[in-house]
Amino acid sequence: MAPRIIRGSLVRWSIVIPVYNEADFLPQTLTSIIAQTTAFHLIIVDNGSTDGCVDNARTQLAEYRGKVTFLYEPRPGQVYALQTGIAAVDTEFTAICDADTFYPPHYLAAATSLFDAKGAGYVAACAYLRREGLYKGLRSMMHRLLAARILPHQNHTSGAAQTFRTSALQAAGGYDPSLWPYVLKDHELMHRVLKRGHQVYHADFWCTTSDRRADRRNVRWTLAERLVYHLTPRSRQHDFFYRFLANRFDARGQRDTVLRERQWAVT
C-alpha cells in the first residue's frame, strides 16, 4: 500500500507500538509519547496480551486528543504485530517504538528535522539508546555515532529507536516473517531499507530503554556473529543474513517468539 503523504500543518508521523503483556512498562512509555511536541497517529498492536495492559492503555489515552488506533494481531510474535501495524500507516514518516522505552519530548521533532534537512535520499533516522549517567551517556552516544560513520550501510541501534520514510519502509517490505522470522529483525530490516537510501544519526536524537534486560543470550547473536556482520562488505550482506545467520539462528531456535518468554528479563 502506497502511503498517503500528509504535509504542512497536518500529521506527518505514525508511531507503531507492538504490545504483549507490558502492564509494568507501557504506561510510562505512553506518557512519554503523548508528551511529544510533534503531532502523530498512534497505532498500538495487541499481540495477545493477557495482563490487561491494552485495556489500561485505552483508559490512559481516553482523553488524549490525537488519533489513536488499536489493532489486534493474534499470531504470536512481535514481527507479526509490527507487520500489522506498519500496514496501517498512511503518513509520511513511521516511528517504531517499544513498550518499555522512554522517548524524550523532542524525539519526533528531532527526527523530522533530520529528514527535512537531509532530503529524500535519506530513508531512515536512527536514535541511539542513551545510558544513564554523564559518562555512560557520552560513551553510548560516541560509540553509536562513530560506528554509523564508519559503517553507514549497517544498523547500529535497536528497533525501538528506528524511524523511517514510510514509502521506503513499505517498499522494502517492512517487517516480514516470511523473510526473517528470527531475532535481530531490526538489523535485517535495515539491510533491506538501506538499499533504498541512507540513514542518519545525531547526538540530539536518542531514547532510553528500560533496565529490565539481564541475560539476553537467547535473544541475540554471538560476538563472533557480530564481528562477521561488521566485517562483511555491503555486497555480501544478503548472504550474511539469509545463508549464514538465518541457519545459525534456526539451529539455536532463536525465532522471534523467544522474545515472549521473558527469560531475559529482570525479576
Write out the residue ranges for each language-model feature.
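Short, acidic, metal-binding catalytic loop of nucleotide-sugar glycosyltransferases
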Residues: 31-40
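A conserved acidic beta->alpha catalytic loop
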Residues: 46-55, 101
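Conserved donor NDP-sugar-binding/catalytic core segment of glycosyltransferases
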Residues: 106-136
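Acidic donor-binding loop at a coil-to-helix junction in glycosyltransferase catalytic cores
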Residues: 180-188
